[in-house]
């Protein structure tokens, strides 16, 4: 695994768990609001973490940690992801995956083999706005739709989440996304933070006020029973 970053202990990234967070490099999207530009655009310039150091840490922390979060970048691009997760599971640790959902084949394999306990999938926009919000004019949004369907049909815990960027996503867009993921376990609206964005122009954009986000929650709740706001 090409590991590029590491938060050794987190109480907030994996609901209900004390976890370590591992960051992979590389991504197939170019989302303008992304805060991990180095991992997305220049992963080769970020030094690899020694994998043996991670395994030694997990062994030492046995009984204290109970989860591992694999995030990015986009973890499903890593060819060693599945065997890596198998090794984590062999340590009796729970696994949370953060993903953009563009590799439904990898997600299906992880779900089918019971290798993940929680998936947080970013749903960037309504289907018609996906090319704009991901920076990919030729994006195949059906692949994202397949991942949405896989999670809705699974028996693990999961959430869909959207970073709400003013000028790019409005109330009607959030309602359309909620309709797209209708019946999901959980949908989270994430507050946009105008810092270190992949597109520096967005650093001049003020986030939505909290009351605006909660109005979006109200509208999304028509389609998803549990809707939350994060980051306000």
Where are these regions (language model features)?
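Conserved AdoMet/S-adenosylmethionine-binding subsite of the radical SAM
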Residues: 55-67, 76-216
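A C-terminal junction/extension of Radical SAM enzymes
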Residues: 212-232
